[in-house]
Amino acid sequence: MTATTPCLWARAPGARKLGIPGETRGNVFFGIDYLVDPSSVAIGQSVAVIGAGNVAMDVARAALRQGARNVTIYARSKHVSASSDEVEFDQLDGAELVYGKAVQEIDDNGPVLRTAIFDEEGAVVGYEDELDHVSCDTVVIAASQQAKDKLVLTTDALVANDRGLLEGGARTA
C-alpha cells in the first residue's frame, strides 16, 4: 500500500502594489499584467522596470522586443532574485541593470529613486538623502506578486504570508 499526499496548487497572479505615490498613473503598469498582453500597451522608447526577479527580466525583454530602445531594471540591493540565465539574456538583449536603487514615488517624468547604502557584507543599511529623478516613457512595477486566488483568500486553514504566499507547516509535504 502506498501513501498519497494531497497537493494544493494556488496561483499568485495578482500584482503586488508598492503603496507609493504615483503607482496608479497612466504610464505605470504592473509586470504580471503587462506580460499577459504586451502589445496592448504603448510602451514608448524608454522603460524603467522596478524589481529584479524573473518577472522583471521577462518584462524588460518584452519591452525591448516591443520596440523600446532604453530599458533599465532597478534593483534595491546588490543581488537579484532572477535566475542568472534571465539576467544574462536581458543584458544580451540590451537591458541595463542598476543595483542599489529603491523607488520612492513615481512622478510625471518617471520613478524617483534613492541610492542604497551597503555594509561590508552587501546588505542595505540605509539610503542616501538625495533623490534621483529618472525620465522615461513607461514604468513597469515587477516587484513580486500576491495571491489573488479565492481559495487562498477565503480558506482559514490556508495561511498566507504578507506576500500572499502559502505558509507551510509540520504536516506540509
Whereabouts are the PLM-identified features?
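Short gly/ser/thr-rich secondary-structure transition/capping motifs
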Residues: N27-Y34, D119-G126, N161-L166
